Amino acid sequence: MTAKTPLHTTHLACGAKMVDFHGWDMPLHYGSQLNEHHAVRNDAGMFDVSHMTIVDILGAGGRQFLRKLLTNDVDQITHNGKALYSCMCNEHGGIIDDLIVYQRASDNYRVVLNSATRQNDVAWIRAKSEGFAVGLQERRELSMLAVQGPNAIAKTLSILAPAHVDAVSTLTPFECVDVDHWFFARTGYTGEDGLEIIVPNEFITQLWNDLLNAGVTPCGLGARDTLRLEAGMLLYGQDMDETTTPLESGLAWTVKWEPEDRGFIGMGALVSQKQQGIKRKMVGLTLLDKGIMRHGQKVIIEGCPDGIITSGSYSPTLQQSIALARVPVETGEQVLVDIRGKLIPAKVGKPRFIKQGKPV
């Protein structure tokens, strides 16, 4: 039986086409994935992301624990109300998940994890927390809404209570704030500015309806996928997993090597890989002819082993097919993609195509 978020009946009332997403009945679109994509790039759209896993790490040992658990270093968080993106790796450097950690207080951290990895992640975090002065709380009584786009914050502020407006209006990117049991973060998964809002389940429907009345477009998983692909944001389980490392996934920037004695989980394996040099890297591909690149297609590189498309689609913003691909490190400026038996040329570039609505 599929799980449902507290907004399930609201999605149906809005005309959503629902699909099974890792055991959750979630909206794919509300009639036009294309219109939803453009709404986020040009105005404001909202996504129900209540299927995500929210875990609060409480206690005096929170910072010490997270410095061991994550590849990025929470010591970079210099004050409460800051967020940090990181990978969480196993002892071999394989990515268990990617996540955002928010410091709400010196003894209160919130991590938001992927829904597909909920059981694995929570079990891993719980096991690794032994010996640290921390307690874990999985917050299933909370719902989460992402409001994204150039007008997202302004439209959100227009429907909030004055106390919320005062707190949210001063947030800068990757900052967060708690107000009256509501949690606001200036983060997202679209490449646009916006907010991710976490509230008790009983408030989420009213928040959705207020945003709808303010002109925010409901958006489904389809638009979320093309938006994040254009922005070069990876999808766990598709672009990376426990068989790949941050260094092979364009995420070396999330690994903090110093101080050397921090000894985060997987550090030894990643240091070794860094010293030996990676054999595979993540790139962006832009198709130079007709066709659509899709997950799993082969990338043909002259004189090298084949690469693989990890994510591919049509880009509504660029109006051509784009993809993320893992290829041999020697790969040059052009490759061939096997699309249904036809070899189509593609240009190799950085694994990011759009920044704040503009081509990179």
UniProtKB/Swiss-Prot annotation:
What is the stated purpose of this protein?
Answer: The glycine cleavage system catalyzes the degradation of glycine.
**According to its UniProt record, which protein family does this protein belong to?**
Belongs to the GcvT family.
Q: Can you cite an annotated GO cellular component?
A: glycine cleavage complex
- Which terms does the record give in the GO molecular function aspect? aminomethyltransferase activity; transaminase activity
Q: How does it assemble?
A: The glycine cleavage system is composed of four proteins: P, T, L and H.
Q: State its Enzyme Commission number(s).
A: 2.1.2.10
The protein's matches in Pfam families, at most eight in alphabetical order, are given as:
GCV_T, GCV_T_C
This chain belongs to the protein called Aminomethyltransferase
